[in-house]
Amino acid sequence: MNLVDIAILILKLIVAALQLLDAVLKYLK
């Protein structure tokens, strides 16, 4: 894996975490 692949993987993980957080916040309200 090169740095570009790692950066893309990290960005995808961040986006998934933000979507999960948003879903949890909507569920709690």
UniProtKB/Swiss-Prot annotation:
<dbReference type="InterPro" id="IPR025211">
    <property type="entry name" value="TisB_toxin"/>
</dbReference>
<keyword id="KW-1277">Toxin-antitoxin system</keyword>
<dbReference type="GO" id="GO:0005253">
    <property type="term" value="F:monoatomic anion channel activity"/>
</dbReference>
<keyword id="KW-1133">Transmembrane helix</keyword>
<dbReference type="GO" id="GO:0009432">
    <property type="term" value="P:SOS response"/>
</dbReference>
<keyword id="KW-0812">Transmembrane</keyword>
<comment type="function">
    <text>Toxic component of a type I toxin-antitoxin (TA) system. Overexpression causes cessation of growth, induces stress-response, a number of membrane protein genes, and leads to cell death. Inhibits ATP synthesis, ATP levels drop drastically quickly after induction. Part of the programmed response to DNA damage; damage leads to increased accumulation of the protein which slows or stops bacterial growth, probably allowing DNA repair before cells continue to grow.</text>
</comment>
<protein>
    <recommendedName>
        <fullName>Small toxic protein TisB</fullName>
    </recommendedName>
</protein>
<dbReference type="GO" id="GO:0005886">
    <property type="term" value="C:plasma membrane"/>
</dbReference>
<keyword id="KW-0997">Cell inner membrane</keyword>
<keyword id="KW-1003">Cell membrane</keyword>
<feature type="transmembrane region" description="Helical">
    <location>
        <begin position="6"/>
        <end position="28"/>
    </location>
</feature>
<keyword id="KW-0472">Membrane</keyword>
<dbReference type="GO" id="GO:0006974">
    <property type="term" value="P:DNA damage response"/>
</dbReference>
<dbReference type="GO" id="GO:0022611">
    <property type="term" value="P:dormancy process"/>
</dbReference>
<dbReference type="GO" id="GO:0016020">
    <property type="term" value="C:membrane"/>
</dbReference>
<dbReference type="Pfam" id="PF13939">
    <property type="entry name" value="TisB_toxin"/>
</dbReference>
